[in-house]
């Protein structure tokens, strides 16, 4: 019997190619055109997106990207490439490709890269620990479109999420412990997850339940009392209600109530990016301190740390 050759596809959201209004506009147009992300009627959404949102948001968002841009590109791209390279070193007999839902490298280029290595089985690992239709679902949709154009398709193993994976929880817990050892134990550990519209959850997206699962498992691994750990949601967009409580409003409230020391982790982000390094580490720090808080630290994402790479290797091992 011929032995199956397996490849691994690491998938993430994507990023602009440069911190310029033009590059950000191209990226946002692709991102915000996905029905998994915004499911508003196209007749209403297209004029709003092209006539208002892209012209107004692109220059502003480009400045935010410029504030965190790294020598090798956007933080998400730099750390994602490091993850790909480290996992390939950890699994030298297994091709590892990186693909983004929006921007480059695309998911299609990642599939083609693996097929060029003559793999006949692909393990797809979306780097979203908690499933959502707007992230993991978007990867599934694009993968289906890509394979629909192929005469011969490989076997596919698709990892839905890993919200309560033992290695993932332990890696998060060790990261928190290291931060506590460096900065002292805070009055509160705040776990900030990317938000989604509340309507998506009402219609069946189990993302909030998966976030609660991670929060519960992490608090248990740390041995922290429930009142010392809080879960919030960030990065809301548009006018409809999103999952609550909102991170920025919660930090303002906590500062006003006299909570002095907070540390914030974003367990849903496998790699640091604009939403963690600018929104959480900078903007929300100012919100908390401006409301009366005294001390605020952001705990970095797992990025390409050895524990994170080992977690990925163990996660895909069952499918290889």
Curated annotation (Swiss-Prot):
Coiled coil: none annotated. One of its GO terms (cellular component) is cytoplasm. Its EC number is 4.98.1.1. Pathway: Porphyrin-containing compound metabolism; protoheme biosynthesis; protoheme from protoporphyrin-IX: step 1/1. It is found in: Cytoplasm. Keywords: Cytoplasm, Heme biosynthesis, Iron, Lyase, Metal-binding, Porphyrin biosynthesis. Catalyzes the ferrous insertion into protoporphyrin IX. Monomer. HAMAP family: Ferrochelatase (MF_00323). This is Ferrochelatase. The gene is hemH.
């Amino acid at each position: 019997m011929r032995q199956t050759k397996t490849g691994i596809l690491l998938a993430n959201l994507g990023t602009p190619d440069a911190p310029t209004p033009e590059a950000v506009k191209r990226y946002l147009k692709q991102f915000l055109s996905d029905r998994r992300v915004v499911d508003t009627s196209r007749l209403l959404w297209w004029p709003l997106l092209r006539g208002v949102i892209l012209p107004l948001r692109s220059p502003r968002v480009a400045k935010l990207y410029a504030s965190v841009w790294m020598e090798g590109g956007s933080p998400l791209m730099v750390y994602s490439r490091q993850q790909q390279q480290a996992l390939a070193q950890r699994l030298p007999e297994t091709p590892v490709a990186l693909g983004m839902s929006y921007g480059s490298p695309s998911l299609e280029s990642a599939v083609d890269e693996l097929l060029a290595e003559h793999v006949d089985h692909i393990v797809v690992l979306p780097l979203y620990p908690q499933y959502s239709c707007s992230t993991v679902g978007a990867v599934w949709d694009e993968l289906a479109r890509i394979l629909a154009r192929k005469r011969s398709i490989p076997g596919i193993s698709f990892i839905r999420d890993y919200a309560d994976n033992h290695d993932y929880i332990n890696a998060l817990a060790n990261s928190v412990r290291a931060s506590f050892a460096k900065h002292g134990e805070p009055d509160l550990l705040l776990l900030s997850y990317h938000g989604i519209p509340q309507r998506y959850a009402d219609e069946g997206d189990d993302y909030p339940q998966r976030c609660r699962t991670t929060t519960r498992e992490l608090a248990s691994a740390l041995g922290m009392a429930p009142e010392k750990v809080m879960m919030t949601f960030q990065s809301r967009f548009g006018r409809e209600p999103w999952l609550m409580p909102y991170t920025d409003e919660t930090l303002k409230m906590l500062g006003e109530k006299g909570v002095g020391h907070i540390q914030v982790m974003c367990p849903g982000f496998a790699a640091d990016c604009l939403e963690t390094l600018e929104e959480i580490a900078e903007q929300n720090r100012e919100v908390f301190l401006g409301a009366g808080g005294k001390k605020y630290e952001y705990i970095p994402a797992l990025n390409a740390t050895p524990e994170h790479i080992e977690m990925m290797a163990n996660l895909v091992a069952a499918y290889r």
